[in-house]
Design a protein with these regions (language model features):
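Active-site beta-loop-alpha substructure in enzyme catalytic cores
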Residues: 122
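Active-site acidic carboxylates
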Residues: 1-101
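Alpha-helical scaffold elements lining the catalytic groove of polysaccharide deacetylases
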Residues: 97-119
Length: 122
């Protein structure tokens, strides 16, 4: 069996100090890095929120359901992976949400499901 780990959106804007911070995000990033080192996956991939112009997804008065504060803007520090996440073992990054909201790596512009299937991950 071919095993893969999908690391989901471990970005600065979702960790402490970011525009949509989750408490403990930096610790999670470090724990994921350690997990990658101590586990045996055939493939490690990551997703990232990477907004170019997501339309109504951003709002100055977000409802936190359909609209959100500005976050993970393409090329910004907030869109970068958190420094506690060691990206050296990540084989492929799948960006999502460039021009519309996307909440799953399987919605990404790149074909995550196809990429995994091509490598025998089921």
């Amino acid at each position: 069996m071919t095993k893969a780990l999908i690391v989901v959106d471990v970005q600065n804007d979702f960790c402490e100090g970011g525009s949509l911070a989750v408490a403990g995000g930096a610790a999670v990033a470090a724990a994921i890095s350690q997990h990658i080192v101590t586990s045996s996956y055939d493939h490690v991939v990551a997703t990232r929120d990477y907004h170019v112009d997501p339309g109504a997804h951003f709002s100055l008065t977000p409802d936190f359901i359909d609209s959100w504060p500005v976050h993970c803007v393409a090329g910004s520090p907030g869109a970068s992976f958190h420094p506690e996440l060691d990206v050296s073992g990540i084989e492929q990054v799948f960006s999502k949400g460039r021009f519309a909201a996307a909440y799953s790596g399987f919605e990404a512009e790149n074909d995550l499901a196809g990429w995994l299937t091509e490598r025998g991950v089921t």
